[in-house]
Amino acid sequence: IAEENRVLERLDVDLIDLNIHRTPINCIQLLIAFLNDFEDRPINRSKVFKYVLKVIFDNPGSLFYGDTLDEENCGFIVGYFCEYLLRKNKESFTEDEFYKITRPFCEKEYNPSNVSDLLQVLKNNQIVVGLNGELRFRFSYWIYYFAAIRMKDSEEFKAYMLNDKHSLYFPEIIEFYTGLDGRSEDIVKMLINDLSTLSNKVHSKIGLSDDINPFKEIKWSLNETVKGMTQNQLEQNIKQSKVSDEIKDIVADKNYNSIKPYTQTINNYLEEYDIKNLMELIKSSSRALRNSEFIKPEHKEELLKNIAMAWKELMR
């Protein structure tokens, strides 16, 4: 592929940037993807997984599986099966279950792929592994990747994922969906709208004033007087806000010890004031913006503006 240290450095960077588990099989699959084009560094995991599947099915040792079995057919068939898993809230399955779901689907779609061979390829490459007498995807991101492909193929399933499963708040699904072709303006428009709505909702619930700036008086050489002014300003703004009394009590406690059991209170606060939802929506939107290379410039600009607005609200 290239000089040894260069390949190792590239492998390490990709594992970190793509948030993929550092396991031998993942390292091997990335190295296989490098064979496709080492100079082309993918910016999203959708491209990585597509490269991996393409090399797996283009492997000369796999040709006996038949000419119709390739990464496109794999995504088409396994995407449908992952729809079944998500609708049933299942993580594991049997071989018979896989055949029972996929064979009628292939017949209906006039797809001649051999699903027995397909499953064997997935098992041979440890995309699907055995556990307690059943099968499951080795890593959950494979389910989300194939589900994203299915969302492209089925408007009905896409509507189900976005409405019933609230997939806008699942960054991995949005990342894979937008990363498949870089043209998902429909999702980007939804993210723009939801970011604006949720940011305003969080702002209204928390009730902190727009002009709060606890850092205004902070300097590199902070004296005790200015420090006290800054702390008092922050505490006063919190007292006048709409956050819960429990949070106000914690802030008011001068001897607060971070190891004391206030974690549940903070978690309840994040839930009650939609902070967690906003955090996940920011993640989804950021990944969508990164992956959406071919949407209209005005949509990119508006999404970036709303991400910044939501981030400001989160930091408040």
Q: Where are the regions that the model predicts?
A:
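Extended hydrophobic
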Residues: 1-153, 163-168
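Extended amphipathic alpha-helical scaffold segments
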Residues: 150, 155-316
